[in-house]
């Protein structure tokens, strides 16, 4: 029997199917070529491919969104406990300093200690429960304090600079006058230390006075270029180096000869080092490079002194080598 099956589709439906087969999906793009020879290869956009690679769900699409920023309970508890420990640390250090930490405790002391532990426990619970609130408050407070300290430091620095510039611009001789007044103040300290009114280490006053004078000059010369300030620091360290060498040589000689300096000797040492240090520093500021040229100057002076002695000795020897006949001829003339 012949199969008399006839399609129920109209010519218009068949034409629509042909158009649909040639249309391109705008979302998926054009269909790539399908190689049927490859094993296991499936045509793209097939139902099997959609099953193996399902589209992203709403949960996956929003996985990179906002997450819960709240800290875990254990971290909150640890930070709150650390803050309470830091708050109690000064009291514990004070009790340890007084040697009264858990020593000779009576009923009253133990009662107070138990009450304080109860208060700390309540504080721990409170801080853990309101963790976000008090941490934000602490951050805001720390930032505000840092800004206040910064503004105060800048204001004080500007005040010091304006004062120093005003003093320097008024008259340069004020630098010398203030430096001399500072020398008088330091000598007053020496006198008070000598008569016992002020207990200071007499052997170290010289360094303190020199550093103080250098800092004073540093403030007065603050408007000068940086190389001048650098030169001031260089001169200060050179002066302190000279003072250290003098002290080392003096102590070494005293130890070598088994001699000891009494109170008057310390005063003489401190006064001499103070005078030498301040003089060298001020001379270095007035004549830059004087300390660097000083070793060469001393070396040339010693060489010329020894050369003069050698010439004198050589001249005496030359006079002794004159023949006797020439001497008699000169005497006759």
Curated annotation (Swiss-Prot):
Acts as a suppressor component of the dual wtf meiotic drive system, and can suppress but not confer meiotic drive by compatible poisons. Wtf meiotic drive systems promote unequal transmission of alleles from the parental zygote to progeny spores by encoding a poison and an antidote from the same locus; the poison is trans-acting and forms toxic aggregates in all spores within an ascus, wherease the antidote is spore-specific and targets aggregates for degradation by the vacuole. Belongs to the WTF family. Residues 1-69 are annotated as: Disordered. It is a multi-pass membrane protein. It is found in: Spore membrane; Vacuole membrane. Keywords: Membrane, Transmembrane, Transmembrane helix, Vacuole. The chain crosses the membrane at residues 73-95, 108-130, 174-191, 204-226. One of its GO terms (cellular component) is vacuolar membrane. The keyword Iron does not apply. InterPro entries: WTF. The keyword Thylakoid does not apply. This is Meiotic drive suppressor wtf9. The gene is wtf9. Residues 19-30 have a biased composition (Basic and acidic residues). One of its GO terms (biological process) is meiotic drive.
């Amino acid at each position: 029997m012949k199969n008399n099956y006839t399609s129920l589709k109209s010519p218009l439906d068949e034409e629509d199917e042909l158009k649909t087969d040639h249309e391109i999906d705008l979302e998926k793009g054009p269909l790539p070529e399908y190689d049927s020879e490859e094993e296991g290869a499936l045509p793209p956009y097939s139902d099997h491919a959609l099953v193996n690679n399902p589209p992203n769900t709403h949960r996956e699409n929003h996985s990179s969104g906002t997450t819960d920023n709240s800290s875990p309970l254990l971290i909150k508890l640890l930070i709150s406990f650390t803050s309470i420990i830091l708050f109690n640390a000064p009291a514990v250090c004070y009790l340890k300093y007084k040697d009264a930490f858990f020593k000779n405790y009576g009923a009253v002391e133990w009662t107070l200690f138990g009450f304080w532990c109860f208060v700390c426990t309540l504080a721990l619970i409170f801080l853990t429960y309101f963790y976000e609130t008090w941490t934000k408050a602490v951050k805001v407070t720390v930032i505000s304090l840092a800004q206040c300290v910064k503004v105060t430091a800048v204001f004080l620095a500007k005040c010091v600079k304006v004062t120093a510039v005003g003093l320097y611009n008024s008259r340069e001789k004020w630098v010398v006058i203030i430096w001399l007044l500072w020398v008088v103040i330091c000598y007053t300290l020496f006198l008070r230390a000598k008569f016992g009114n002020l207990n200071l280490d007499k052997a170290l006053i010289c360094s303190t006075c020199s550093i103080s004078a250098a800092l004073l000059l540093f403030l007065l010369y603050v408007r000068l270029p940086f190389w001048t300030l650098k030169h001031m620091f260089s001169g200060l360290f050179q002066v302190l180096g000279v003072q250290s060498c003098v002290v080392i040589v003096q102590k070494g000689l005293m130890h070598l000869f088994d001699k000891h300096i009494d109170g008057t000797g310390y005063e003489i040492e401190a006064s001499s080092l103070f005078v030498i240090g301040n003089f060298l520093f001020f001379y270095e500021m007035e004549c830059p490079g004087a300390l660097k040229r000083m070793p060469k100057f001393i070396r040339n002076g010693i060489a010329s002194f020894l050369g003069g002695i050698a010439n004198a000795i050589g001249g005496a020897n030359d006079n002794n080598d004159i023949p006797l006949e020439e001497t008699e001829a000169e005497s006759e003339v």
